[in-house]
């Protein structure tokens, strides 16, 4: 078969695929994502799914495989973990809209997102208690810098580095993906490769510091980056590369990035990769979390608190003032056991607002993400009223929990207690929030009640007790009887009222003028109700995004409180003592115990 005989659908597929040669293309066809040619061969093997054929191209059968849209996240995660990148091409219009352009018109499709190891946001694709970092390493003349972000939380940080420090810096972050210029030096490339993350080469232009500065100023709405700190050219280039890559992978829908924070060289302890691995700080030598120092110390009850603990352990501070402030915070909750338990009890009810906010910003969120923001802020407000005289670190955290009454009130009034996952399912706007929606729902629901009455009337009229009114997506509503009643239904006088629609192996299906009219009424009301709910979802999403800064600050405050309370619980339950920390070189430990060994012995019943 020649290219001239390529079907319009396959021509569209090949055009989209040509723009993403390094990615597996998930091509939406109805309820499935289909893959073709080499993509199908690779994906079928990686996912352990059936490989089939569909038509011919250039004289060769077209390899094909597919996965259901509703289960696609699990398949995506498998592909990402096996080193693939995935371009997701969605249908940009309904088939009915395509038909208006002609009966041979193909439904418009385009890539809406490029899924890579460092750009995951879905709850099912992420580890709740760990950050998922995307890093960029820039080299400008003699400068080297590292920028990193977790787009699921919006964190954005940058620091100067060097050939000597880049290895330990990357080991500390354990990024999922690292961006590097195609023009990087060989020594730098070799050092970055050692971190084990997926490496993504970008063009030299993506690391241009001048264009990066302009882009960052526009993104953050400032005239100069000096408002956030004094950044070197390599630091600006690294941040710019991150933003460029996010723009590419998210197809123009940038995540809600926090204002950039610059980490100073010497602000935290440098630990090289080998030492970090041998110390088993965040992971045991086996690669798992169990058996690590992190597992032994983690008493946090929120996902954000757990992520903060891992960051603190991976990057021990060298700032004596900051260390003392953290110790003061823990001590205050060690001394007040009642407050500590009250605090932890409330925190257990706090959802992962960081990641809910990120999904809403990327337009991938649903009603449950709105509910997570509402429920989290309700608990934040509750805590702010309970917590009084606290050390400075915790007092600052509590301040961020206040001032959310307006948003909480709006979300509480608008949402049901337990919304569905997806906005398209409807049923998430609370009764009483919108009179028009309530009326439309009543019409829809009453129409469905009339169906039951109509079925009873038809049973009485025909004398067929087994007659049912059913619904499917092909025929809509229809009257169904078993085939042994077909002759009666197809003969006068019943045939004058019941119009034959379909005969199957064991059933015969009919419609009536009254049933068709009622179906139109029900469908119109149902569709109208769903459209109203979708409008409310967008209004609520925008209301949350307008308060994104204060909401993000509240999540950071809750994480700080959770971490302090968790460490205080550890100190009380396991009899840990507060260290005396000063700027001397003295290291004096009396009666020390190994936390990981002690935990292992307790779990084995030996300690």
What are these regions (language model features)?
Residues 1-335, 352-358, 362, 425, ...:
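Basic, polar low-complexity surface loops/patches
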Residues 4-5, 488, 497, 539, ...:
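Conserved NTPase motor "head" modules and their coupling/switch loops across ABC/AAA+ ATPases, GTPases
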Residues 32-53, 145, 155-157, 168, ...:
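A conserved P-loop NTPase coupling/switch region
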Residues 91, 179, 191, 233-280, ...:
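Structured, non-catalytic alpha/beta "coupling" segments that mediate domain-domain communication
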Residues 91, 254-263, 457-470, 568-591:
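Long, charged, glycine-rich C-terminal linkers/tails
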Residues 362, 418-436, 507-510, 514:
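Short His/Asp/Glu-rich catalytic/ion-coordination signatures at enzyme active sites or charged loops
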């Amino acid at each position: 078969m020649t290219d001239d005989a390529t079907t319009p659908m396959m021509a569209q597929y090949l055009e989209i695929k040509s723009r993403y040669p390094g990615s597996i293309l998930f091509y939406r066809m109805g309820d499935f994502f289909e893959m073709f040619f080499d993509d199908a061969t690779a994906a079928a093997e990686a996912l352990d799914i059936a490989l089939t054929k569909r038509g011919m191209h250039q004289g060769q059968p077209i390899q094909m495989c597919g996965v259901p849209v509703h289960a696609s996240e699990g398949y995506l995660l498998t592909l990402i973990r096996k080193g693939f990148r995935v371009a997701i091409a969605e249908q940009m219009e309904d088939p009915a809209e395509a038909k208006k352009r002609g009966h041979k018109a193909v439904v418009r499709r385009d890539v809406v997102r490029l899924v890579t190891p460092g750009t995951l946001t879905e709850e099912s694709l992420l580890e709740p208690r760990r950050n998922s970092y995307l890093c960029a390493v820039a080299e400008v003349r003699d400068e080297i810098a590292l920028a990193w972000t977790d787009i699921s939380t919006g964190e954005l940080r940058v620091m100067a580095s060097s050939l000597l420090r880049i290895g330990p810096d990357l080991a500390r972050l354990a990024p999922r993906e690292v961006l590097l210029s195609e023009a990087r030096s060989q020594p730098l490339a070799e050092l970055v490769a050692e971190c084990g993350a997926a490496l993504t080469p970008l063009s030299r232009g993506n690391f241009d510091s001048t264009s990066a500065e302009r882009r960052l100023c526009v993104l953050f709405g400032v005239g100069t980056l000096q408002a956030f700190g004094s950044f070197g050219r390599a630091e600006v280039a690294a941040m710019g590369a991150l933003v460029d890559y996010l723009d590419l992978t998210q197809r123009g829908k940038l995540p809600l990035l926090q204002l950039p924070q610059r980490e100073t060289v010497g602000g935290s302890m440098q630990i090289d990769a080998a030492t970090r691995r041998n110390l088993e700080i965040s992971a045991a030598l086996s690669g798992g979390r169990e058996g690590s120092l992190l597992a032994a110390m983690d008493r946090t009850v929120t996902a954000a608190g757990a992520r903060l603990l891992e960051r603190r352990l991976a990057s021990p501070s060298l700032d004596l003032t900051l260390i003392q402030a953290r110790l003061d915070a823990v001590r205050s909750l060690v001394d007040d056991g009642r407050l500590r338990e009250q605090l932890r009890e409330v925190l257990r009810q706090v959802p992962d607002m960081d990641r809910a906010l990120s999904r809403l910003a990327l337009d991938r969120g649903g009603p449950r993400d709105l509910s997570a923001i509402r429920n989290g802020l309700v608990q934040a407000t509750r805590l702010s009223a309970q917590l009084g005289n606290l050390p400075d670190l915790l007092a600052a955290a509590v301040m961020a929990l206040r001032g959310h009454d307006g948003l909480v009130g709006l979300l509480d009034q608008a949402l049901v207690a337990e919304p569905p996952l997806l906005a398209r399912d409807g049923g998430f706007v609370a009764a009483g929030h919108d009179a028009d929606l309530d009326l439309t729902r009543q019409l829809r629901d009453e129409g469905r009640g009339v169906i039951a009455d109509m079925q009873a009337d038809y049973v009485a009229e025909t004398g067929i007790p087994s007659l049912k009114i059913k619904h499917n997506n092909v025929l809509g509503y229809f009257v169904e009887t078993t085939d042994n009643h077909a002759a009666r239904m197809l003969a006068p006088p019943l045939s004058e009222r019941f119009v034959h629609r379909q005969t199957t192996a064991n059933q015969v299906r009919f419609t009536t003028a009254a049933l068709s009219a009622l179906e139109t009424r029900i469908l119109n009301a149902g569709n109208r109700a769903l459209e109203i709910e979708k409008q409310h979802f967008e209004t609520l999403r925008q209301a949350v995004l307008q308060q994104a800064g204060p909401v993000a600050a509240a999540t950071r405050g809750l994480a700080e409180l959770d971490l302090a309370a968790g460490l205080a619980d550890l100190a009380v339950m396991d009899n840990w003592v507060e260290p005396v920390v000063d700027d001397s070189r003295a290291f004096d430990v009396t009666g020390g115990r190994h936390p990981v060994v002690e935990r292992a012995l307790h779990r084995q019943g030996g300690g």
